[in-house]
Amino acid sequence: MASSLTPRSPYPKKENLGNARRGMGVKPGPRRNVLSAINNGGGTNSDTASVDGGEGGAGPAAPVIEFTGREDVERLLAEKMKGKSKTDYKGRTEQMSEYIKKLRACIRWYIELEDGYLVEQEKLRSTMDAENAQHAKLEAQLSSDLEELKAAHLNLTRQCDSLEESFNKEKADRMLAVESYEKERQQRESAEASLDLLSVDLERVSHEAKRFSEQLKMVQDTNKRLQEYNTSLQQYNSNLQADASKSGDIISKLQKEKSAMMETMASLKDLNNSMKNHLDSSRTSQQEAIRMKEQLMKEVDCLRIELHQIREDRDQSVSQVNTLSAELANYKELAGKSTKDCESLSVKVSAFEETCSMQQEQIQTLQKQLAVATNKLKLADVTAIEAMTGYEEQKVIIKDLEERLASAEFQIVEADKLRKKLHNTILELKGNIRVFCRVRPLLQDNDSSGAEEALISYPTSVESAGRGIDLMNQGQRFSFSYDKVFDHGASQEDVFVEMSQLVQSALDGYKVCIFAYGQTGSGKTYTMMGPPGRDQKGIIPRSLEQIFKTSQSLESQGWKYSMQASMLEIYNETIRDLLAPGRSNNFDLSTSKQYTIKHDPQGNTTVTDLTVADVFSSADVTSLLAKASQSRSVGRTQMNEQSSRSHFVFTLKISGSNENTGQQVQGVLNLIDLAGSERLAKSGSTGDRLKETQAINKSLSALSDVIFAIAKGDDHVPFRNSKLTYLLQPCLGGDSKTLMFVNISPEASSVGETICSLRFASRVNACEIGIPRRHTQARSFDSRLSYG
């Protein structure tokens, strides 16, 4: 700073005046407040800028030089030497020394000013450090309080969910108990309706039950053999195929026997109805007998009263006759009455005797009637006792028949479970993709003609029942067969029951993938999501309810599970995070993010920067599904009022560990709702809808190319042709259990798309992707979710 303020000198030696300051012995005075001494006008104070008389301090005292501001410094720098000639070196030297002293005083003033600034800066810095420390302490305390509040809020939320779940469970238990009581009452009433005719078929049913027991024993033996072979399935695959064919024959026989039993049950139902009518007539007869018994009892009571009255009248008449006879004798002996009086008395006696004889006859008649009524009463009592005894016997027989029927039905159910288990085992050994077909019901606003009603039919043969579907188009029949076919009357519960075992595999450590395919408006979203309501929920909410319920039941065996969920959509070949914080109402604030699909050597798939949420109950997933549904891209077309315009992918990562055995499992459940294929001529899409339709059809076409390449066994499978196929690569070409739902429309206007969907499903069903592998070894997972 001093060198910048020093004026240029005409002499070269004055260029380094700033450096000569140290050699002159000029020492700065003590620090002081800025300009305080100068403004106060102190003369000899050490805080005042002064100049010594000479170089050694021997000269006369110089006047005090004070600087009050920048103007004084500039004035000093602008000062010129005058009054001396060029040859007067001594005078010029004195002027130069005086000028140097002024410069030294100026420099000293600047140094003191700078020292004051430094002191004030140090004070401000210490004050700022103290304020920052206090602010950090306060911020840490606030963060701690906020974390405690969040933890308390989360705890209260979990307690509320737990209480609500307990309340719903108790309410459901009560409703179940009421339904059970009502069902038991109805069964008791129906049991009372079975009487005499069941005894005719009792022997035949017992023979059939015995035959069913023998067949069940044979099935159990077969099951035992299959369980023994299960330990060496990989080594003896060909042998198991032979056993599977034998099991198929047994299953066919069981299906036939099941049909026979269903016919027997129908005949038993008819028999029950006839027995119910017979019981009603018996009850009517019994009530009539009881009414007649009561009437006879009343008549007997009346007859007894009349008999008692007649006996009293007879006794009174006899006493009167005796009295008159005694009087007559007395009259004859004592009074000597006239003959006329005697005749009148005789007439009276005869009348009395006639009355007595008539009353005697009436008494005999009443006694006979009383005996007949008593016999009838005894006969009615005997009949009632016999009827009650027969009723109790029939009740015992009916109970025995019901137990046998329930046992036979249980055997049929167990045989069907065995069939499903064997079928799943065969499919796992083959490594095929399983395919289920579901037919959507005709909509109410569509006029269904006879041609539309006859468009789709279902084979009734034992081999194809429940697995085949026939389609008529222009007089030509197209037949297809899949692992399961659901007609238009199948409920959401029926659909989920068939695939519940596959969902269970995710908890066992397998990778599971379920996706819905079909044209737009064929019911894919209804099958996967379903509308709100207990009976209408789709595969995704039902699967999550089963997983959480099963994981809770396994806690008693030492298992603990942690689950993470994520949801995304592929819209116009762009991945969108449906759970992103800034996404709502189909508007994505995080479109700047570039989501990348990555596969690792273990077959796990991750999507970078994707939102992953920890879930602890089905209620947590329900709220996430509601948020994702609001964010998903939907639109209106001519074929569908609410058409999904993107592929929806829900993924649940499951990590489980057993404290007792130390075993760890890691499973993944992928549930996918594909966008529907559509033809531009029918959908009438334009603008953005046209771009969406083209992107959807392109990705589905890429999926078809992948399926065809796998079916033909090509060395190269074009998984990278679309985001959808690249995301599904572990499911279509890895070691996962994969199930495809093909949804079709029964309308005649959609028959072309329906045939294409069914043909594509047949090719998918023929694809062999490898045997599923269970992941039981502990591995470090990325913090983001795996789609493997």
Swiss-Prot record:
Binding residue positions for ATP: G518, Q519, T520, G521, S522, G523, K524, T525
Which InterPro entries does its entry note? Kinesin-like_fam, Kinesin_motor_CS, Kinesin_motor_dom, Kinesin_motor_dom_sf, P-loop_NTPase
Q: Where is the Kinesin motor domain?
A: 432-767
The source organism is: Oryza sativa subsp. japonica
* Keywords, in A-Z order: ATP-binding, Coiled coil, Microtubule, Motor protein, Nucleotide-binding
Ranges in a coiled coil: 121-430
Q: Which Gene3D superfamilies match?
A: Kinesin motor domain
GO biological process per UniProt? microtubule-based movement; spindle assembly
Q: Name one Pfam family in it.
A: Kinesin
Q: Where is this region: Disordered?
A: 1-63
Query: Can you say what this protein is called?
Result: Kinesin-like protein KIN-14H
SS bonds (residue pairs): none
Query: Which PANTHER family does this one have?
Result: KINESIN-LIKE PROTEIN KLP-3 (PTHR47972), PROTEIN CLARET SEGREGATIONAL (PTHR47972:SF45)
